[in-house]
């Protein structure tokens, strides 16, 4: 995101967009700001397509859904969903078992409390709180409201494979194995999903080839973040 500054007596002073307009200067709109504006106006589908990408601070984000997710504050699905596809960081789900599901995990706690550690801060003002489902190891389906999350097995495949039940609908973008692949430091990376597997100490994941898998919550794998604007 471009920021507005004015140099006064050699000191750089940050200005709001409104202050810039009062000075007769038209602020530069970043791509994420434009996407947010069009999304809220219900015009995203007229301007963007699934698989379009934007780059923010050197990190690539792909549009995986338009109108897929529901804004928690309005109940409307005028959203654009993006997924981080490169420069993927690693984390474990939890230091031990996680019987109460993703919302009780250390990873989810970090995404909520320290989002600036996960995505560029310039994106954060535009990220919206949306409704997400998650399944626990015993098959219970629960609801959470989040700005940052990792995807579910059903959102990736359209059905439960290693999860005990479905938690969400498949995004249009994830039609093939290739569509699910993301990149870490050394090429294609395995990454976590928020769906529990049929054990309190295991969660679903995607392998480096875009296929379904699962592993212990204590192991460190990629965190391919999703969010909506």
Residue ranges of model-derived segments:
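Collagenous Gly-X-Y triple-helix signature in extracellular proteins
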Residues: 2, 17-229
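Short, intrinsically disordered N-terminal pre-domain segments
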Residues: 1-17
């Amino acid at each position: 995101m471009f920021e507005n500054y004015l140099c006064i007596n050699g000191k750089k002073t940050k200005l709001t967009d409104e202050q810039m307009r009062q000075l007769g200067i038209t602020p530069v709109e970043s791509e994420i700001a434009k996407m947010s504006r069009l999304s809220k106006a219900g015009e995203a589908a007229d301007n963007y397509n699934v698989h379009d990408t934007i780059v923010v601070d050197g990190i690539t984000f792909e549009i995986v859904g338009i109108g897929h997710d529901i804004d928690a504050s309005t109940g409307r699905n005028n959203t654009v969903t993006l997924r981080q596809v490169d420069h993927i960081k690693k984390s474990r789900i939890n230091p031990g078992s996680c019987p109460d599901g993703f919302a009780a995990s250390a990873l989810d706690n970090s995404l909520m409390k320290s989002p600036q550690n996960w995505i560029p801060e310039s994106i954060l003002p535009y990220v919206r709180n949306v409704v997400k489902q998650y399944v626990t190891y015993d098959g219970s389906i629960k609801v959470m409201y989040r700005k940052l999350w990792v995807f579910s097995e059903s959102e990736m495949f359209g059905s439960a494979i290693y999860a005990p039940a479905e938690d969400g609908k498949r995004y249009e973008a994830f039609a093939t194995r290739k569509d699910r692949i993301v990149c870490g430091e050394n090429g294609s990376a395995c990454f976590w999903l928020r769906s529990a597997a049929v054990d309190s100490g295991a969660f679903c994941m995607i392998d480096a080839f875009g296929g379904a898998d699962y592993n212990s919550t204590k192991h460190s794998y990629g965190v391919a973040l999703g969010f909506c604007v």
